[in-house]
Amino acid sequence: QTQIIDPEFLYLIIESFVQYESKKTNSTETALKNAITNSILSYRNTFLNKFDARFVLSKMQDFIDNVDTNAIIGSEVTVRVQRRFEPKLNESASYTIKFNVPIIRGTLLNKLSSTQFTVFDVGGTLREAQFEEIPQSFTGISEIQVTNPGAGFTTTPTVTISGDGSNATAEAVIVNGKIQSINIINRGIDYTRATISITGGNGYGAEAVVVIDGKSGTLRTIYFDSLAQRQVINSNAGKINYETGEITINNIRFITVDSNDGLIRLTSQAEKGIIQSVRNTIITIDETDPTAISTTLTSV
């Protein structure tokens, strides 16, 4: 019996910057842009839109550069990945969104963001909001995961965090002689790697691993007030795993969604120029989305 697999779509947002010599082409700027758009869609039709596909940035750039080999000098392309999900309206729920590809840790000007929706703020006022990644200029400890709770603890053991950063501290929570969790007291700064040791407390066998900010990030919900100033609704609306591209959205109640199809779009820059589809994922470029393909031409 044939098994029918429902696909999940990973959408690519393509932003190309193309240098060309205007004296070497009879095409207008508009015509050249349209030809570049068609070349990108031709790449999609040839290599994407199917299971077990692979996006290769350098090959797509060849399609762009070959639009007019006489006039086009070269191109640079930024690729963002986008996942879409349908929220439950007027109902509190949490969500897990899987890009299934590594994504770049955001900066102040380039970070994960979303399309708009409405939620109530803590004061009960309805706000037109969006998700955004909190840019962080340092790497602290974001989480400590207990991998073995151990046994026999009668007092709180000492938790020591070692690594190339400084000032991170944590405290164990003991329940029935075992370590139930380890709470972070001070996240510390400048860590790229860290280990943890658990000593004392009369117990034995407890083990834990440290997760640093380089591998994870935080989502917040924000809105812009009448003066166009950013206001934070929830500073801990979710988590980002940069290595796996998994987004966890904490419990939230959406009221409305600002899109005709009822979907919220999460967009982030891809970490690598080669993107392999996994499981039931189809990589595609949505030509009906006006933001999917943009081209900036520079004449030299």
PLM-predicted stretches and their roles:
Residues 67-82:
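Short, well-structured beta-strand/strand-turn elements
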Residues 137-139, 191-200, 213-219, 226-300:
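Surface-exposed interaction regions enriched in Ser/Thr/Asp/Glu
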Residues 133-218:
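Conserved, function-critical positions that sit in or immediately flank catalytic
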Residues 6-13, 53-62, 80-86:
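A glycine-rich phosphate-binding loop feature that marks nucleotide/adenosyl-phosphate handling sites
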Residues 16-22, 99-101, 268-270:
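Flexible glycine-/small-residue-rich
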Residues 94-136:
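C-terminal extracytoplasmic interaction modules
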Residues 1-51:
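Carbohydrate-recognition loop of C-type lectin domains
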